[in-house]
Amino acid sequence: MADRLIVRGAREHNLKNVSLDLPRDSLIVFTGLSGSGKSSLAFDTIFAEGQRRYVESLSSYARQFLGQMDKPDVDFIEGLSPAVSIDQKSTSRNPRSTVGTITEVYDYLRLLFARIGKPHCPECGRPISRQSPQAIVDKVLELPEGSRFQVLSPLVRERKGEFVDLFADLQTKGYSRARVDGQTIQLSDPPTLKKQEKHTIEVVIDRLTVKEGAKRRLTDSVETALGLAGGMVVLDFVDLPEDDPERERMYSEHLYCPYDDLSFEELEPRSFSFNSPFGACPDCSGIGTRMEVDAELIVPDEEKSLDEGAIHPWSHGHTKDYFGRLIGALADALGFRTDIPFAGLPQRAKKALLYGHKTQIEVRYRNRYGRERVYTTPFEGAVPFVKRRHSEAESDASRERFEGYMREVPCPTCQGTRLKPLVLAVTVMEKSIAEVAAMSISDCADFLGKLKLNARDKKIAERVLKEVNERLRFLVDVGLDYLSLNRAAGTLSGGEAQRIRLATQIGSGLVGVLYVLDEPSIGLHQRDNHRLIETLVRLRDMGNTLIVVEHDEDTIKVADWIVDIGPGAGEHGGKVVHSGSLKELLANAESQTGQYLSGKKSIPLPDIRRPRDPSRQLTVHGARENNLQDIDVSFPLGVLTAVTGVSGSGKSTLVNDILYTHLARELNGARSVPGRHTRVDGDDLVDKVVHVDQSPIGRTPRSNPATYTGVFDHVRKLFAETTEAKVRGYLPGRFSFNVKGGRCENCSGDGTIKIEMNFLPDVYVPCEVCHGARYNRETLEVHYKGKSIADVLNMPIEEAMHFFEAVPAIARHLNTLNDVGLGYVRLGQSATTLSGGEAQRVKLASELQRRSTGRTVYVLDEPTTGLHFEDISKLLVVLSGLVDKGNTVIVIEHNLDVIKTADWVVDMGPEGGAGGGLVVAEGTPEEVAGVPTSHTGKFLREILDADRISDAASVKAPRKTAARKTAAAKSTTKKTATVRTTNNTATKKAAAVTKKTAPAKKTTRARKA
């Protein structure tokens, strides 16, 4: 078998005829600037060819069902293994997917519970078990010798009727006695039963005494009783008193609770699946949640009075007056005021306003002629009103409007567990499958490791437990110990989802595979990095080849082989700058990566931090969504704030689910519902909020940077104003490739034509009419400065910038695109070919070129994903530019280069999952570095100057919030007080720092200019 992976002549995307040899069974890191061609080489060339060759080996029939891979543009590749790619894009958004189902741990748990679980009755909680006739006889013979009992066969249990035929039938079969409603009767003289009452009838099969010789007769009697009653037998011990619970013993051949008359189906693994009708909760169909109206959203601000519109759905629009009259009539009927805050209303009034009032109320109003009119009506209440209007809504807009007052709440039937009550009553060591799935992965591993089983169960569970424990161990190893198995897959971050798939791959135990990974360290705190690296090394040691596209310094330093692609991005990249060991990379003068790793280049620390103004800040009060523990957090305005903390500590919940969603709802009129919190102060100080993420800027090849940023509209107008266009009567629409008129109709403005090949991959060929130009001949005859519209779309942005420098509207857009480091991207480059980092910078550029009010909040979630040290340096310049205009930038980040340049840091923690959700430290990076309990502070200490930390170390007050909060968890009042005082100390000290630094700040700004 070849010991090298040989690539020759790779020309995919911007690769310039790349040839390289890579060692097999090694950890290889591909690095380089964003857009330099790393993914083109790793994913679109090496992985695509490995996958394609495997698929080619299948029959043509099987191939048509598999996603076909295009043959990459490469001369040849040798030494390829079957390839598995683990990227971030293919995360499941299915609401039925959970961490347990993705990792298959839940499948093994279902098997475990189906085979060794102990069923209980969901009503009375008694254990249920099935017994064979022999087992029943053996149990009876264990009782004290001489105990007298009768064997009864229960034929009727609590059913109405006279049962005349049944008594006659029993007599003909030779039975002489029966027990009716607890009274023994002779069948020769049956009682007359009342037809309308419920009766219980048991026929007496035999009367016996416990002794060794009675075994044969007892077995026959029990078998007869079981046969008559469909698998049930009752033993009545006549010597015991009537009220003794041991007097009657019921046995069953099936899973059946005789006390509640519930019978159970045979337990199978599918009974525990919430994706199967056999196990799913019938009310929520296994989703676990339902949309319910939330009173908190109907009255978002309890300080408002009813006259000021406290009840939000009734406070605006043309129905405002109508509801005002209704509320006034209710106030008269119940005797409460409408001009005091909603919070001060009596409980009875609140209940009636929200949930309705049964008795009719008298409503008075004046019609348009000034006459007074009176009518009576029931008062519906805001909650039932929203529910009714939501269910009756005919348009999406109307439905969305009322969904804004609803929250997803756990299904009341299954309490969010997704399963039937019968299934939840099956336990292993007193825990149901839902309770095991709700544990964190580390707790679940501990629980399964400590299982105490009898010999039979141990034998059955042995292999299942081995599989589950291995999988759980791998999940812990990749730093996901804080996740629970029932966590919905849609709520995972890209990095978490990728590491879950990584753990699943290790669990599969394959050898000789080529794994291609895309930045597995995303979303991982420096503290957990070593665990991930150990996992990658273990995968390699099993005999696999790993190609990791990565910018993380620790991972690059551990690699056996490093490939640096560059030297620039886009047109300026696509070459192999370095392929070899770390030592050679550090000495390579041409490699940007080498210069940053060796310390020749670095991202500088700002000389001075922007001061924080205590009077201008956004404060979230009482944040308690997911794992947040009722915390108050302030974000100063007009500075760059970094929110840090280990994975799962609650950063995204705080910033995205609560702060951003609240601001989007208040300022942008969005309909989404923020996470649970008491209130947000300071939102009147900002007028817009923008969320810049790494999702694609468009999902169709027709979307491109020119159309996304809006610069294409100006370009089309410019072309329409040329003399030639005016002579021909062309309008700006003529120069669009999306509408009929100017576009080439043969390819509908795509420039390529798709030819379907059934079981071969679809082939895209350039359109033979326009030859890929997208426009018809007449449109292309219009020129500006000698270039057609197609030539302009094909220009790199830096070239277009000089071309259009005389046109301010266009130049402004292009300058911002160039400032964020996208000069190499072509104006008309399809959005689908842009990397995540590039898409994010296109969004940033389109925001940057808007006229700034200086009151905008920008929220960025891990903006350094996919960015090289050099790209991060450019990004920080852009973000500083936004802040210098007076805006506020809040970033969720693990990258220390970004954290060290921030003006303010909010560090969440101390751990992930249930161990997080508190603010461990807040202050400048120097202040956070001085906090011993902060994991982020520990790593900041290593990169900040020691004297800067010692100067700032005096501010330690806010750190106590986390410690105090856990101690004072029972006393809420105490809790809020702590936070307030700590904030005050921080504020005073920050103000003091501000005074000292103000003059110095001016000089740094001047130097910059």
From Swiss-Prot:
Transmembrane segments: none annotated. Residues 998-1009 have a biased composition (Basic residues). GO terms for cellular component: cytoplasm; excinuclease repair complex. It comes from the Bacteria. Its main location: cytoplasm. InterPro entries: ABC_transporter-like_ATP-bd, ABC_transporter-like_CS, ATP_grasp_subdomain_1, P-loop_NTPase, UvrA, UvrA_DNA-bd, UvrA_inter. Belongs to the ABC transporter superfamily. UvrA family. Forms a heterotetramer with UvrB during the search for lesions. PANTHER family: UVRABC SYSTEM PROTEIN A (PTHR43152:SF3). This is UvrABC system protein A. It comes from Streptomyces avermitilis (strain ATCC 31267 / DSM 46492 / JCM 5070 / NBRC 14893 / NCIMB 12804 / NRRL 8165 / MA-4680).
